[in-house]
């Protein structure tokens, strides 16, 4: 998986797009013919642990597709809750556990074709189309806390990075930050690339990192 570099100061540049940084568990999702496989950074299979996410991704037509994203627990504002997700993975939450959502932000293989060499903007457009065709994108989630269709969320880019980031910080939303990505960048698996830059919210403390 490609990983972002860290940068503290926000910046605005039309050649970059900006996404909310979801705080959870990085996950590749392979889908083909209704069958889904979920893989960790180290390519360990943990498909059985997230049946609702698997059922949602199984709605994707065609394949094989390979998605990159983050498994998260989302609160009533749609903000990822790392501590709750960690407790869920550690089996410290009972039967009424919160739903896990797959936050998809990139597409690496589309209908069997490697698209990692395509610009990020193209890959995100293809990802959005694939999820739309499967009925996995809605304008507004209908529940509180929001439950996205079949536990899958398309991570769209923010329309105005500097303003949105400032508003989120001033509102006190508990987000880790944003990830800035160069629009024309290709995907480099296993590389910490300067084309992806993590901008942390001031005062944010890093959560625990799993290595699986």
Where are these regions (language model features)?
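Catalytic cores of nucleic-acid ligases and guanylyltransferases
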Residues: 1-212
């Amino acid at each position: 998986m490609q990983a972002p570099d860290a940068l503290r100061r926000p910046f605005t540049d039309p050649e970059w797009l900006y996404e909310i940084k979801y705080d959870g568990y990085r996950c590749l999702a392979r889908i083909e013919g209704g069958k889904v496989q979920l893989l960790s950074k180290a390519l360990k299979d943990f498909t059985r642990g997230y049946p609702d996410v698997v059922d949602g991704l199984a709605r994707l037509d065609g394949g094989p597709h390979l998605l990159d994203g983050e498994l998260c627990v989302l609160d009533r504002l749609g903000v990822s809750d790392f501590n709750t997700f960690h407790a869920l993975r550690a089996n410290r939450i009972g039967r009424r556990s919160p739903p896990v959502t797959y936050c998809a932000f990139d597409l690496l293989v589309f209908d069997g074709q490697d698209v990692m060499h395509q610009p990020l903007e193209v890959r995100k457009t293809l990802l959005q189309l694939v999820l739309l065709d499967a009925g996995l994108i809605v304008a507004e989630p209908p529940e509180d806390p929001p439950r996205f269709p079949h536990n899958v969320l398309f991570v769209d880019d923010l329309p105005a990075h500097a303003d949105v980031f400032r508003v989120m910080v001033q509102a006190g939303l508990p987000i880790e930050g944003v990830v800035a990505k160069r629009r024309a960048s290709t995907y480099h698996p296993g590389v910490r690339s300067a084309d992806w830059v993590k901008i942390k919210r001031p005062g944010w403390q890093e959560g625990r990192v799993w290595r699986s």
